[in-house]
Amino acid sequence: ITIVGLIVGFTAPIIGAIADNYGNRMKWIYLFSALLIIGAFSSWFGLPDGSNWQWILVSFGIGFVGAELAYIFSNAQLPSLGNRSETGAISGSGFGFGYVGGLVSLVIVLTLFVEQENGKTLIGFDPIFGLNAEAKEGTRFVGPFVALWFIIFSIPYFLWINDKPKPRIGASFGSGLKDLWKTVVSLRDKKSTVRYLISNMFYRDSLNGLYSFGGVYAA
């Protein structure tokens, strides 16, 4: 998990700068969304006894990196989705619907799929679709369920968002790094921004820790 976090931490600023320079961000969102889906689906092959824990960690890492990097490019689209006064509302609505969707999906998997020690779900049902409780197939199905949930509820986004602005003149990897360096240098005069970035880093690390280990403690 630490390695994955470092990969995202070091690549995110560079990729973010590139996202601001290149025109069509959707192709990158498709790519990183595919990584998320592959990682989630792959977790199905994690064995209940943990004997192939390496596979589980790699699957998690692929999905996590895909999700975080796709998030960067979707953020870069915000200025083109409305005028400046609407940006906060659009961003907040996206976060809100995302958390509601996460809560609804959690209720679904706990009540219909994830088996308890007695082989029943939280409300006393057998895992649906004939999933084998003894093989923990209900719990293992959570990964594919997440992938399917993401695919289904991403369809409106991919259909409605038409992100094809013209790239900046001379937009390139080099110009992205140049913009990144200018931003870093400018932080010397933006102490409040630095404090926000540092606090946000700890906040996001805490959330990632909860996401990663919450299931272990709950089990």
Stretch-by-stretch model annotation:
Residues S59, G63-F97:
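Cytoplasmic helix-loop-helix junction between adjacent transmembrane helices
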Residues A19-A34:
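Cytoplasmic membrane-interface "Motif A"-like loop-to-helix N-cap segments
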Residues I1, S212-A219:
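Short amphipathic helix-loop junctions that connect adjacent transmembrane helices
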Residues I161-I198:
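Juxtamembrane intracellular "pre-TM" segments in multi-pass secondary transporters
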Residues S105-N118, A147-K166:
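C-terminal membrane-cytosol helix-exit motif in multi-pass small-molecule transporters
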Residues I7, F64-E68, S91-K120:
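Glycine-rich segments within core transmembrane alpha-helices of 12-TM secondary carriers
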